[in-house]
Amino acid sequence: MAVFTAVTEPQLAEWMRHYDLGDVVEFRGISSGIENSNFFLTTTRGEYVLTIFEKLTAEQLPFYLDLMRHLAAHRVPVPDPMPREDGALFGLLQGKPAAIVTRLEGAPELAPGVEHCIEVGQMLARMHLAGRDYPAYQPNLRSLPWWKETVPTILPFLEGGQRELLSSELAYQEAFFASADYAALPEGPCHADLFRDNAMFAHAEPGTGHEVRLGGFFDFYFAGCDKWLFDVAVTVNDWCVDLATGKLDAARTEAMLRAYQTVRPFTAEENRHWGDMLRAGAYRFWVSRLYDFHLPRAAELLKPHDPGHFERILRERLSGVALPGIHTSCN
């Protein structure tokens, strides 16, 4: 179970004194988290999630919590951080930063279809546009500078083709990031980790004509300011793939990209570099999974994800993938 920091009833009662959220009805740990300790919290006022941040510091948290509050205020369905009585969005619990956010309706869809991808594509574009006037800035902390720092620590564990691919793709991405076309790509706050287990779906309302309804996006704690196309690529690389092979499913991919473009059409530069950004999205998670696999953190309680999954995806993307109706090449 992914609760790294336990909370007793007296500790919870003392913590809740700082909030105007009613009386506690139920409190239980959530098993799915890998970075933080998460708990479902039901009170007489509603349903929430309490998160104790195991790695993020009090100095780092405002960017993420304020972004979520900003998006929620712009009608993007995301967890809305609840202010304490002093107005702060987090405090210290068990000596660690902790926050309470609203609980999204629904459950993750781990086998998404075309309609799920349409919902995600449209909402991702809405989220990008809603974040344009968010005043704070923080770069994506898992982008090129982190790759350049991390790859040398991973290479000694790899052999042959893996070493060659990890090094050659880093060089390719460095050149891409330095290009004028890359500089021209639209950017702003990005989720940067919008996998299928970071979205909720609820039952659609009768008579709406929709089979599914997006409950919202969550887990914004890898968010940062980056190229919007990178966020799209990360999302497509998870929602639209065959998990066994890493190959893109054409129907889901086209559905998500067309849905996104009904809200925010891609620019010429984005069309031209779609293949490059799919590679960047795959590379980012291959690097992080290799790092977690070969250099696990002290006291890591969970089994790391298989790095081979994103190696397969990267190798698939090297052949080039087109946006709907537009032929693009990685070369």
Curated annotation (Swiss-Prot):
Gene3D superfamilies: 3.90.1200.10, Phosphorylase Kinase, domain 1 (3.30.200.20). Pfam families: APH (PF01636). CDD domains: HomoserineK_II. One of its GO terms (molecular function) is ATP binding. Its EC number is 2.7.1.39. It catalyses: L-homoserine + ATP = O-phospho-L-homoserine + ADP + H(+). It is an enzyme of class 2 (transferase). InterPro entries: Aminoglycoside_PTrfase, Homoserine_kinase_II, Kinase-like_dom_sf, Pseudomonas-type_ThrB. It comes from the Bacteria. Keywords: Amino-acid biosynthesis, ATP-binding, Kinase, Nucleotide-binding, Threonine biosynthesis, Transferase. One of its GO terms (biological process) is threonine biosynthetic process. Pathway: Amino-acid biosynthesis; L-threonine biosynthesis; L-threonine from L-aspartate: step 4/5. PANTHER family: AMINOGLYCOSIDE PHOSPHOTRANSFERASE DOMAIN-CONTAINING PROTEIN, AMINOGLYCOSIDE PHOSPHOTRANSFERASE DOMAIN-CONTAINING PROTEIN-RELATED. Belongs to the pseudomonas-type ThrB family. This is Homoserine kinase. The lineage of its organism: Bacteria, Pseudomonadati, Pseudomonadota, Betaproteobacteria, Burkholderiales. The gene is thrB.
